[in-house]
UniProtKB/Swiss-Prot annotation:
Ranges where the record places region Necessary for membrane association: 32-66
Effect of residue 33 to L: Loss of isoform 4 expression
Source species of the chain: Homo sapiens
Effect of residue 3 to G: No effect on down-regulation of angiotensin-activated signaling pathway
Substitution effect: residue 99 to G: No effect on down-regulation of angiotensin-activated signaling pathway
Impact upon substituting residue 41 to D: Impairs association with plasma membrane
A single MF term (Gene Ontology): calmodulin binding
Name of the protein this chain belongs to: Regulator of G-protein signaling 2
Origin: domain of life: Eukaryota
């Protein structure tokens, strides 16, 4: 995708040709670039679906994994636009949204949210404590490898809470990240060409009868 974007920048920097033929060629190049970007997006999603796993759940065989990520019908995909929760509840939708966030370089938001969902289901106090520290070092502390964008007061509160970890350690931060995704990334995902393509109903072509 980066190479395609670089080509787009190169194209925009070239001097404009005033001839009609040049304008037609420019339009063709833009359409070709859009198709390339969409193809690359689909490739990324396909790879992601084949190599992703939900936190806290054991990996299963190839057959069950393929069944879990069956491409939705246009009607099912359209349901994702009704509410953000509808998108997150779909395994394919969640994987598609993660791939989209990865393309926007903000995948840490959904990863943090999923880690919190897994954390809240943890029953063992020992596991709760170790998971809390891992989430803190991965997403919360300053210069964490996947640092999320939350305010200093919330970070300080979390640092205090994980000393005696409870299932509500990250509730405030999770709600803020959820709101950020719902109000920013989610609308952009719904406008993406990939999502629009999923919602398109296949055109039925009828072959002419032989005479």
């Amino acid at each position: 995708m980066q190479s395609a974007m670089f080509l787009a920048v190169q194209h925009d920097c070239r001097p404009m040709d005033k001839s009609a033929g040049s304008g037609h060629k420019s339009e063709e190049k833009r359409e070709k670039m859009k198709r390339t970007l969409l193809k690359d997006w689909k490739t990324r999603l396909s790879y992601f679906l084949q190599n992703s796993s939900t936190p806290g759940k054991p990996k299963t065989g190839k057959k069950s994994k393929q069944q879990a990520f069956i491409k939705p019908s246009p009607e099912e995909a359209q349901l994702w636009s009704e509410a953000f929760d509808e998108l997150l509840a779909s395994k394919y939708g969640l994987a598609a949204f993660r791939a989209f966030l990865k393309s926007e370089f903000c995948e840490e938001n959904i990863e943090f949210w999923l880690a919190c969902e897994d954390f809240k289901k943890t029953k063992s106090p020992q596991k709760l404590s170790s998971k809390a520290r891992k989430i803190y070092t991965d997403f919360i502390e300053k210069e964490a490898p996947k640092e999320i964008n939350i305010d200093f007061q919330t970070k300080t509160l979390i640092a205090q809470n994980i000393q005696e970890a409870t299932s509500g350690c990250f509730t405030t931060a999770q709600k803020r990240v959820y709101s950020l995704m719902e109000n920013n990334s989610y609308p952009r995902f719904l406008e993406s060409e990939f999502y629009q393509d999923l919602c398109k109903k296949p055109q039925i072509t009828t072959e002419p009868h032989a005479t």
